[in-house]
């Protein structure tokens, strides 16, 4: 499928060590999912990458239903990863990345902070909730949610 933006490609969203290990074909197979991945990338991830100034690594992007349901993943049946509306971005300092996304006013649906990555989702064509959530495993600093700092 090729390039989405100057720093992201569809293959990055399809790449999955878990899928490879268990012989699961994890390929974006519908235009609807492809368009959702494109929208997430162009509206949230590429602007974040531009502001961050360093590469962003996708740990988990698109997940076919079989991969999402695999015990090694344990994804929710309603996961936005299945729809192409979510990506988990590796971060040595997840709160710094999340704070930047918040301060930029990026139109995310959910931003969930984990110890080693940040989950970003964006509902294709839908209203975005702008939720900042923390996985129970995350014990670090919290995002400063100040409306004066948020541009969006």
Predicted regions located by residue number:
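Extracytoplasmic cell-surface/polysaccharide-interacting catalytic and binding patches
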Residues: 1-51, 138-152
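Glycine-rich, flexible loop/turn motifs
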Residues: 4, 67, 78
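N-terminal start-of-chain detector that recognizes signal peptides
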Residues: 31, 59-63, 91-95
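Generic detector of well-ordered alpha-helical segments enriched in charged/polar residues
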Residues: 34, 38, 68, 98-99
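Extended, low-complexity, intrinsically disordered C-terminal regulatory tails
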Residues: 42-73
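Catalytic cores and adjacent binding grooves of peptidoglycan-active enzymes
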Residues: 78, 82-83, 87, 91-152
